[in-house]
């Protein structure tokens, strides 16, 4: 299965194949696969075992084939001898390889990713990867979710070839952070036909008091074979500061804005309305304040 994506830089449509597509079809579309998923693969134990395999020296041999398969441009990253596959996966990008808009009114992307935009309707429901979710289900907090009625939801889907570190979108301070434990499932379209993907996943959200966008909620969501979301202990931050990173696997970031706070760039809006994600980079302008 492939996913249709708009490449904003090249102004063209391309098709992305899903990581380990055949294995996912087996897990979600067969009786034996679903039994394995329920009893073992989607458990914390399996995720921890997988993390151990990706953190040992033997996993280094996986790096070169991975780079070749996903055509990763390693000239963008720091040159170093990686100690494991996970060390490679959480690699840091070279300074200057991502441009951050300095305009206070500009909304930037927190990560290299594929972006979709959703309006939060009167019923506080949003369409996330072909399933319907309320903001309350995502946050596990109905009272907090009501603050975002008629607001905007931005979904940034990171795939295995993306840079898996992410940043703050504005100057501000952390009000509080909450961790929600769940069962791990993949974020792509195959699994979303079978499960409420996000409500089943481990996730962590931060309530941010930002200078230009008010009270923003940023949610990091883990996926199949991802056991860790690593957020730095930062109370006060600047636009573009690193917020954290994901360990191995495709993962997702969700941003929630209150009503009439932001105005998205037209191209992103148009493709989102057509059900097509937009490929963007961390720090790239994707919208602005709705003045």
UniProtKB/Swiss-Prot annotation:
Topology of the protein relative to the lipid bilayer: Peripheral membrane protein
Keywords from the UniProt entry: Cell membrane, Decarboxylase, Lipid biosynthesis, Lipid metabolism, Lyase, Membrane, Phospholipid biosynthesis, Phospholipid metabolism, Pyruvate, Zymogen
Cofactors required: pyruvate
Entry's localization field: Cell membrane
tRNA processing recorded as keyword: no
Residue numbers annotated as active site: 112 (charge relay system), 251 (charge relay system), 251 (schiff-base intermediate with substrate)
Keyword Lipid metabolism: yes
GO biological process: phosphatidylethanolamine biosynthetic process
Subunit: Heterodimer of a large membrane-associated beta subunit and a small pyruvoyl-containing alpha subunit.
Protein name: Phosphatidylserine decarboxylase proenzyme 2
Organism listed in the record: Clostridium acetobutylicum (strain ATCC 824 / DSM 792 / JCM 1419 / IAM 19013 / LMG 5710 / NBRC 13948 / NRRL B-527 / VKM B-1787 / 2291 / W)
Gene (UniProt): psd2
């Amino acid at each position: 299965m492939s996913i249709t994506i708009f490449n904003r830089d090249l102004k063209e449509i391309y098709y992305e194949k899903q990581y380990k597509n055949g294995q996912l079809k087996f897990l979600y579309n067969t009786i034996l696969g679903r039994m394995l998923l329920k009893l073992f693969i989607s458990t914390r134990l399996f995720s921890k075992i997988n993390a151990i395999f990706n953190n040992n020296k033997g996993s280094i041999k996986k790096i070169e084939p991975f780079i070749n398969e996903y055509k990763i441009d390693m000239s963008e990253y720091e040159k170093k001898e990686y100690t494991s596959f996970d060390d490679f996966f959480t690699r840091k990008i070279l300074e200057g390889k991502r441009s951050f808009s300095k305009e206070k009114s500009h909304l930037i992307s927190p990560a290299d990713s594929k972006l979709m935009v959703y309006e939060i309707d009167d019923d506080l429901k949003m369409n996330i990867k072909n399933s319907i979710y309320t903001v309350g289900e995502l946050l596990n907090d109905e009272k907090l979710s009501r603050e975002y009625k008629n607001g905007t939801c931005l979904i940034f889907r990171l795939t295995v070839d993306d840079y898996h570190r992410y940043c703050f979108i504005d100057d501000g301070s952390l009000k509080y952070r909450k961790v929600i434990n769940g069962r791990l499932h993949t974020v792509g379209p195959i699994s979303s036909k079978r499960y409420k993907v996000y409500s089943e996943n481990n996730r962590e959200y931060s309530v941010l008091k930002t200078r230009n966008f008010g009270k923003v909620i940023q949610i990091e969501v883990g996926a199949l074979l991802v056991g860790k979301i690593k957020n730095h202990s930062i109370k006060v931050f600047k636009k573009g500061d690193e917020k954290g990173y994901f360990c191995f696997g495709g993962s997702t970031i969700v941003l929630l804005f209150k009503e009439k706070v932001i105005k998205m760039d037209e191209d992103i809006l148009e493709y989102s309305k057509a059900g097509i994600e937009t490929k963007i980079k961390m720090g790239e302008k994707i919208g602005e304040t709705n003045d």
